Amino acid sequence: MRVLVLGLDSPLGFSLRAFAAPLMRHEIIGVDMDATRWRRERQVKKLIRRQSLDLILDARLVTQIDGVDPVGQPDLERTRWLASLAARERIPYFFLSSARVFSGTLTRPYRETDHPDATDPVGRTLIDVERVLTEALDEIFI
């Protein structure tokens, strides 16, 4: 299985690479965080089409949530590009989101079935990203 990992230099990327390599069942094709700051859709097309991928694992946004460069509209646009290409090529997509999609106002633990209700800009952007992915893709796991 050929897996494209977006955010290979993230903690999750390092762990995934360390876990998958000894098993030799999966080929990890990694893209570091800085290299995912695409400015044009063409850059994403080249990345996707040059590889014969079985899965896209997107760890970009969960990694940069509390980073120096906050999650914002450029990330939403990049996600649109990725979703469109993954749908066209019929590549399953695994997106790592965050609990930031919830406001934290409930007095009980949140469930997967709870409606995202974030009010902060990062949480709202993550909600928009999840919406873009679920609308564009048949095979999406968030």
Question: Which residue ranges define each predicted feature?
Answer:
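A short beta-strand-loop structural module common to alpha/beta enzyme folds
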Residues: 26-38
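Conserved beta-loop-beta element that borders a ligand/cofactor-binding pocket
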Residues: 94, 98-100, 130-142
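Short alpha-helix in the Rossmann-fold core of NAD(P)-dependent oxidoreductases
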Residues: 71-79, 94, 122-126
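Hydrophobic beta-strand scaffold residues
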Residues: 28, 55, 93, 140-141
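N-terminal Rossmann NAD(P)H-binding glycine-rich loop of SDR-like oxidoreductase domains
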Residues: 1-24
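Active-site "gating" loop of Rossmann-like NAD(P)-dependent oxidoreductase/epimerase domains
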Residues: 62-73, 99-120
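Active-site beta-alpha turn of Rossmann-fold NAD(P)-dependent dehydrogenases/reductases
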Residues: 7, 60, 97-98, 119, ...
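NAD(P)H-binding glycine-rich loop region in Rossmannoid oxidoreductase-like domains
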Residues: 35-78, 85-87
